[in-house]
């Protein structure tokens, strides 16, 4: 297992490259109760030249770590109803991820009500106090949320949840306006969400982002097949 990189070192590594999100949830075709599928996707991503992996769950991350030294952005998806945030939503999930020695922990930093009752700035501060050497990424949906996380000391701001909160911009593709605005504000942006084509990734890279995460367009074959099938119907 490689040593955790500094923010500067990681930014060098991610610059101009693609981070591939390798995830499958129960009910999806590539989900397996016994595991073993996500490391195959990660291996394919590495062979293609990916600069990092985003992965969900302790099991999947451990399996991916066994086959690659690429930096991992780790999350744990767990529902806490009736609250909506479910991506690394409490300190419990942060603790589990911190024990894995991964490069970055990503967590929901939207303004929605949280299970722990904290506001985002307080949650970020608590995590930073507990794990001062851990790089952190805020999954947000709006410019204001990104700015709050940035000002609270988060290392990276991901546009992951734009279009997935009721109050954020609803678009079929990536939220280019949000990505550009955060970059112009001096935020280290990891663009993520609805990036469907190499052309979109190139446009995003030209905005000066710190990194780009592509998931469904690479690692969700059902979604990819549906896009082709729908195109023939239109």
Swiss-Prot record:
Q: Does the keyword Endoplasmic reticulum apply?
A: no
Q: Which reaction does it catalyse?
A: an N-acyl-D-glucosamine 6-phosphate = an N-acyl-D-mannosamine 6-phosphate
- Keywords, A to Z? Carbohydrate metabolism, Isomerase
GO MF, one example: N-acylglucosamine-6-phosphate 2-epimerase activity
Quote the cellular component terms of the Gene Ontology held in the record: cytosol
What Gene Ontology biological process does one annotation of this record name?
N-acetylneuraminate catabolic process
Q: Under which pathway is this protein filed?
A: Amino-sugar metabolism; N-acetylneuraminate degradation; D-fructose 6-phosphate from N-acetylneuraminate: step 3/5
| Its EC number(s) | 5.1.3.9
The record's listing under InterPro entries reads: Aldolase_TIM, NanE, RibuloseP-bd_barrel
CDD domains under this entry?
NanE (cd04729)
Question: What family is this protein classified in?
Answer: Belongs to the NanE family.
Q: What does this protein do?
A: Converts N-acetylmannosamine-6-phosphate (ManNAc-6-P) to N-acetylglucosamine-6-phosphate (GlcNAc-6-P).
The protein's name: Putative N-acetylmannosamine-6-phosphate 2-epimerase
């Amino acid at each position: 297992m490689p040593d955790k990189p500094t923010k500067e070192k990681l930014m060098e590594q991610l610059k101009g490259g693609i981070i591939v999100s390798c995830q499958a949830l129960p009910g999806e075709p590539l989900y397996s109760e016994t595991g073993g599928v996500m490391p195959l996707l990660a291996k394919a991503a590495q062979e293609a030249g990916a600069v990092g992996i985003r992965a969900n769950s302790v099991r999947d991350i451990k399996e991916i770590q066994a086959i690659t030294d690429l930096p991992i952005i780790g999350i744990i998806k767990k529902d806490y109803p009736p609250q909506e945030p479910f991506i690394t939503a409490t300190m419990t999930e942060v603790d589990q991820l911190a024990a894995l020695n991964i490069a970055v922990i990503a967590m929901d930093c939207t303004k929605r009500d949280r299970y722990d009752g904290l506001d985002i700035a307080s949650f970020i501060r608590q995590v930073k106090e507990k794990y001062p050497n851990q790089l952190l990424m805020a999954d947000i949906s709006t410019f204001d949320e990104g700015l709050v996380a940035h000002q609270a000391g988060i290392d990276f701001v991901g546009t992951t949840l734009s279009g997935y909160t009721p109050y954020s911009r609803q678009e079929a593709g990536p939220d280019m306006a949000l990505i550009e605005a955060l970059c112009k504000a001096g935020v280290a942006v990891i663009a993520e969400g609805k990036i469907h084509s190499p052309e979109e990734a190139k446009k995003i890279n030209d905005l000066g982002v710190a990194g780009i995460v592509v998931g469904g367009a690479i690692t969700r074959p059902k979604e990819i097949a549906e896009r082709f099938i729908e195109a023939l119907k239109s």
